[in-house]
From Swiss-Prot:
In the reaction, the free carboxyl group of octanoic acid is attached via an amide linkage to the epsilon-amino group of a specific lysine residue of lipoyl domains of lipoate-dependent enzymes. This is Octanoyltransferase. GO terms for molecular function: lipoyl(octanoyl) transferase activity. Keywords: Acyltransferase, Cytoplasm, Transferase. The lineage of its organism: Bacteria, Pseudomonadati, Pseudomonadota, Alphaproteobacteria, Caulobacterales. It comes from the Bacteria. It comes from Caulobacter vibrioides (strain ATCC 19089 / CIP 103742 / CB 15) (Caulobacter crescentus). Belongs to the LipB family. NCBIfam families: lipB, PRK14341.1. InterPro entries: aa-tRNA-synth_II/BPL/LPL, BPL_LPL_catalytic, Octanoyltransferase, Octanoyltransferase_CS.
């Protein structure tokens, strides 16, 4: 999923939590500028304050505790998800007219990016038919289960993507109990720290950056939109 011209993608990191409405406004403005040819592609890494977002397929019954955190309609694909401190959100603003107008290939590239980044910590990320995102199989004495470690939800406008992925590094996993995450009632959520790994957001950022370059091409430091 690389550009033919190998132009680098901007890589920006916000060091303070960004309110969701401000992030969406900045994303939409940047995506429009990319489509107009007045701005370059951008990957924007950030955290949000605790909140829930509803994708276009969200079901009202999956919002179990509507008063727990603010709830936002997102317009992205998918259902309900949680964002909050300790979770690395990466908003992906890429021009698919330069990379191939193939939505399936784009989502597969996002999955490959996450899986390769997890491998840096010796975590095997897996895909499951009919379940969006990246999963980790966990086994113990006489038991096994599959927990979600990363979510994917994107939107395209004029063939420019926005929204993106979220990777659970060290969020408060109890915050997911206010929703049915991504409509999955039979499976849980996990994080790198929950798996027993002493991983920081900086560690995750380094792995995500290295893996992105493998899948999508080179990056260069950029200023965060907010």
């Amino acid at each position: 999923m690389r550009r033919d011209d190998a132009a680098p993608v901007g890589w920006a990191v916000s060091t303070q939590p960004v309110p969701y409405p401000a992030a969406v406004a900045a994303m939409e403005a940047r995506a429009a500028a990319i489509a107009d040819g007045t701005a370059g592609e951008l990957i924007w890494l950030l955290e949000h304050p605790p909140l829930y977002t509803a994708g276009v397929s969200a079901k009202a019954g999956d919002l179990i505790q509507p008063d727990r955190f603010p709830v936002f309609e997102s317009g992205r694909g998918g259902q309900f998800t949680y964002h909050g401190p300790g979770q690395r959100v990466a908003y992906v603003m890429l021009d698919l007219t330069q990379r191939g107008r193939d939505v399936r290939a784009f989502v597969a590239a996002l999955e490959a990016w996450i899986i390769d980044a997890l491998a840096a910590f010796n975590v095997t990320g897996e895909l499951r038919e009919g379940r969006v995102g990246v999963w980790v199989e966990r086994k113990g004495a006489g038991w096994s289960r599959e927990d979600k470690i990363a979510a994917i939800g994107v939107k395209l406008r004029r063939w420019v993507s926005f929204h993106g992925i979220s990777l659970n590094v060290e969020p408060d996993l109890s915050h997911f109990s206010g929703i049915v995450p991504c409509g999955q009632t039979e499976h849980g959520v996990t994080s790198l720290v929950d798996l027993g790994l002493p991983v920081t957001l900086d560690d995750a950022d380094a792995a995500l950056r290295a893996s992105f370059s493998k899948v999508f091409g080179p990056v260069e430091d950029a200023e965060a939109p907010v």
